């Protein structure tokens, strides 16, 4: 049976991956929801207006929205379907993306209810990355500790000859 750690990583990976595929698709096409698509268009226009550096670099709201949407879809697919290290890399890119989105929301002065989902999914991405990068607990390889006092060697037996260990 799979360990609880593995089940947690798989569940978070699939849920987060599907969420980002969905959100990225909304940014790319109005087929899923015309209202959400038009809201995304409006929001990204305000992000570009609030950050003139993007205009100087030649990045307009359409390019920004489509590139973020494509990155979300690609990383979401990797998080959902691809095993191993690429999943952690996609997790890291999505975490950076969430931080950028939080920055944009703060920049334009959006209320908390507009970006609360980004906070929650940023925390979930962080948790998934921490759990995935934590080394596996190898309790079976550890030596079993003696259970009774008779099985425990005395301090005298542990100490080198001629020396007594004092603790």
Curated annotation (Swiss-Prot):
Basic and acidic residues bias: start-end ranges: 135-145
UniProt-listed GO biological process terms: chaperone-mediated protein complex assembly; positive regulation of protein localization to cell surface
Segments on the Cytoplasmic side according to the record's topology features: 1-5, 83-88, 133-167
Membrane topology classification: Multi-pass membrane protein
Protein name: Novel acetylcholine receptor chaperone
Glycoprotein recorded as keyword: no
Compartment(s) of residence: Peroxisome membrane; Cytoplasmic vesicle; Endoplasmic reticulum membrane
Tissue: Present in adrenal zona glomerusa but not in adrenal medulla (at protein level). Expressed in the hippocampus (at protein level).
InterPro entries: TMEM35A/B
